[in-house]
Amino acid sequence: MDLKSLIRDIPDFPKPGILFRDITTLLQNPDGLRYVIDQFTEDYREQSIDYVVGIESRGFIFGAPLAYQLGAGFVPVRKPGKLPAAIHAQEYELEYGTDRLEIHQDACPAGSRVLVVDDLLATGGTAAATAQLLAPLNCTLVGFGFIIELTGLAGRQKLPDCHINALVEY
């Protein structure tokens, strides 16, 4: 399936000079959405995944149904202040400042096999912060699954020891 045909380009969003890759049109297409989940399921079916970790917020959209298909649990990585129990937190750099991601301390038992899913790999900051969040849990990071990778932003370089699967590259 040609996923690029289901992803809308929005020039100058969220600011001038940015070409935004809008996945809402992919989400609206039942065949496209099914294809994404089925493709990731096929790619990871034999990997004995225990937990799919979805990064807020679009990682939730793909991560929960993928976890279901793989017979795995789903774990959300959230923005600050959204998780009610004890957390691990990781700050990461933005273009102008920093942000933080959080995960419950008991999200994945030690030794669990974990797959991280999100919609987009751009600079790699969010993905790298998520990998760092998982480290104190002593789980095995099997890899990352992304719908889109913006190759010109070199996000893979921040994940040098991780398997990365991107369904679409720009």
Swiss-Prot record:
It is an enzyme of class 2 (transferase). It catalyses: AMP + diphosphate = 5-phospho-alpha-D-ribose 1-diphosphate + adenine. Pathway: Purine metabolism; AMP biosynthesis via salvage pathway; AMP from adenine: step 1/1. Gene3D superfamilies: 3.40.50.2020. One of its GO terms (cellular component) is cytoplasm. One of its GO terms (biological process) is AMP salvage. Coiled coil: none annotated. It is found in: Cytoplasm. Pfam families: Pribosyltran. PROSITE patterns: PUR_PYR_PR_TRANSFER. CDD domains: PRTases_typeI (cd06223). Catalyzes a salvage reaction resulting in the formation of AMP, that is energically less costly than de novo synthesis. Homodimer. HAMAP family: Aden_phosphoribosyltr. This is Adenine phosphoribosyltransferase. It comes from Acaryochloris marina (strain MBIC 11017).
